[in-house]
């Protein structure tokens, strides 16, 4: 991968009072809650809203009355929360200033703000490209308790710390037993975790009563970092489990972090260093909830040229694995897709990852490295995967950005083909909306570090539906940024503000 606490509560909002009164342990999911990165542990990036049809997409417009002010740079995806029985909802936005903002989802006014400590100045790190460094990985919400979990890079006495917080959505207060200092607790178990060299860009996830946090390095691959997954028991936050790569490097740094299905976690690792034998890099790894190491070929995959990928910094870790099912002659086929910086797509059997060289299908699908997070949706029993990159099967010769959609068909040897391509200037992570789970799919993407606009395309043929030309150019969009959808709005997080689009 080269590439003390303060709380400010804004009073006087009746809508905020209604909202926080309804947050309780009996909370249950509203239809448009967005609790984690890409709207679920599978990281599909799919949202279902009957009202967002192809026709309605043409009339999407910027909500210029939406305030949406936050402090600091924004790399993490916003989340959306409506408590059980509440008539209003909130956006949760975490920033590199180590602040968490709860905003009213309609007006954008502040409900509460929580500061989690001093972010890390770049001068305290050996390398990296985020300054200051605070909250980068997308948090996750536990709907059963009304709690948001996140990892914050905190500087204390000029020493970097990774601290995992649990905050009440009622008022942003820290729950008892939190935060957890990752390096300190692991050290108690005689494990070495170098908080200065470990970066936390990937999204957190919740599975079976545990919080899982992925770690990689910083841009520049400096210091003694490894790919880590740390599990924290929600009932006993002082109880940690962990898995790490055997070789140095192998970071888990994609914005989607950890994908999950059932009781299984899936991660993609980056390039390792000085590994003469395969040591967990350039891989898709399945982990059980206790994070024990498995040497079973069914629980890992790496390309046969893993060592060459190491040497070229062409790792699989730039995108998170995505899980999906397709139709085949023998019924539904459980698959997983990995996309590499080498421009290749690897289709794996989700129940048997196959070990080294064990993919079901592999194809060159991009002329340039594939980064960020893909989105996946289904049509007619086949899977479609959208990513921002210069597609190998695309006719255009765009060099400043392209949206590529692959079609994956089932079978003993699944086929990978290019469904359609469209030019989009930028580098972000797309999402997909449908009206019922499959009908009228729309691929949405923002021109992060490009044209700064929102774009929407028909998912079946790539026809442009919305190009954002009548709306604002969104300033402060960082690469890998994605957006979220609710039943009547789209939201995009950017430096010091959130943009809202109504439909």
Descriptions of predicted regions:
Residues 1-6:
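N-terminal secretory signal peptides that target proteins for export/translocation
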Residues 9-22:
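Bacterial N-terminal signal peptides
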Residues 25-29:
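Boundary at the C-terminal end of the N-terminal hydrophobic targeting segment
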Residues 30-291, 297-327, 333-355, 366, ...:
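Mobile, glycine-rich extracellular loop/lid and propeptide segments
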Residues 357-367, 416-420, 470:
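Inter-blade linker and blade-boundary elements of WD-repeat/beta-propeller domains
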Residues 400-405, 410-429:
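Detector for outer-membrane/organellar transmembrane beta-barrel domains
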